[in-house]
Amino acid sequence: MTQGLFIMCPGQGGQHAGMFDLARTDPGAAALLDKSGIILDEATLFDNALAQPSIVAAALAVWEALRAHVPAPMLAAGYSIGEIAAWSVAGALAPLDAIALGRVRAAAMDDAARQGPQQALAAISGVAIDTAAALAPRHGFEIAIVNGYDACIAGGLASGLAALGDALAAEGGKLQRLPVAVASHTSLMAPARAAFDVALNALPFATPACPVLGGVSALALRSKGQAVDELSRQLVQTICWSDCMDAAVEAGITVALELGPGSALARMMQARHPQIACRSVADFRSIDGIATWVARQE
């Protein structure tokens, strides 16, 4: 049986109108999606209010369908909003509570964004992290997520995008605006913390069956206090996803599975740690196909 299973829960970017289809082939997962009350609307899939809870729901519905057919994970982690889903995968949060928390998080972040000028999130590639971190503040941006040696996400005011893009191009880098209207994981999200923290503290947390890697700290966390602190801080602090991948490998994982939607996390893991067997559920046509692949790994 496969040992060292690492479950990865994605953030925004890979959502699509059919992202519940695979999970709906399982009665239990279909029931969870029905109870969530989420109706996917292609026109608003990238709006926070729908995107965040639906991404949590998609990941947890697939996990509901899959978990009886794969070994218990040794570790879980989530990218941005995916960190909420990861705590549910670990057994600490009930799935419907996690989805509801995703709704609160989205609303709080949208409220924070409305308090000032238009915000933006953008992918930076082709320059070292140190270079990106030096250039971003000159144009009103902060590093939101570190994905690799020369890949990160930056958040800030939309008015500074063009100038930041020019500065990066002069250094051989590239800037691509993302379909996210809030500057996630930057100080601009500070007004979102109060409402989110109230909802977060009110939720019942069970003892997780496996640790969850904190997105900010890349530490293996197990308690409600640690979860509350990390989930709150990640609204306004940099997500160190590259460190999370490294920490998972150092912990001894042998197989990594992204729950989807999308396959961005699987691609990043494959690029950074090619020795790890890694796939996304988005690569498969059936729950049985996923379970069979996991079982074949050693």
Where are the regions that the model predicts?
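FabD-like malonyl-/acyl-CoA
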Residues: 1-131, 255-289
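A short, well-structured juxtamembrane/interface segment
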Residues: 239-247
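Non-catalytic positions within long, well-ordered alpha-helices that form the structural scaffold/packing
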Residues: 249-252
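Non-catalytic peripheral regions of patatin-like phospholipases
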Residues: 59, 195, 200-203, 222-239, ...
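Residue-level signal for well-ordered alpha-helical positions
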Residues: 135, 167, 268-272, 293
